[in-house]
Amino acid sequence: NYRCIVAHPINPPHLIPAVEIVPAPFTSQSTTKTVKEIISSIGKEPLELNKEIPGFVVNRLQGALLAEAFNLIKEGICSAQEIDKAISEGLGLRWSFMGPFQTIHLNAPEGIAGYVDRYEKMYQGMFEHLDIEWSSVIKLGLEEELLKLYDLSEREKYEKDRDNRLTKLILHKTKT
């Protein structure tokens, strides 16, 4: 059992380089090291977790963002299209080459400590309310809006466009 380990890719796995590496408490360090080397050797980026957690890291981060996105729809703050643009034309562009911690570290002259000092209470106040059932938001018209924007009968076209854009972004990132 010392060789048991989880290697969790992110969709679409043929393009996204990140692969979460999740050793069990009984997994040997040698196994973890070998798996990371194999993952790296095929052009992927291993993300080593210190311990297993439901959803691992990528799904949990995505889930946190989606929880607030569903809440914004529920509260009538903006449309799904505006939320998608907030990511694709805002956070996503920046986060594609620098993660959230690097971003906030650079957003305050004093780095992350200054950022936390300035904004911690504001962010804590923003998220006291997050107790939302995502399915209740679907009933408020979210699904209809998304189906108008992204007709699932054209899913293959959207996936091809996504893959082309990701490929270009990845190629761009490797050049700099």
Report residues per predicted region.
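Short, flexible helix-loop junctions that flank or precede catalytic/ligand sites
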Residues: 52, 71, 89
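Rossmann-fold dinucleotide-binding core
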Residues: 1-51, 55, 59
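Residues within well-ordered alpha helices
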Residues: 38, 71-72
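Charged, alpha-helix-enriched surfaces in structured cytosolic catalytic cores
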Residues: 2, 26, 30, 64, ...
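NAD(P)-dependent Rossmann-like dehydrogenase/reductase catalytic/cofactor-binding core
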Residues: 33, 44, 74-176
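Residue-level signal for short amphipathic helical patches enriched in basic/charged
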Residues: 13, 64, 107
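Structural/interface elements that position substrates and couple domains in central-metabolism enzymes
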Residues: 58, 62-68
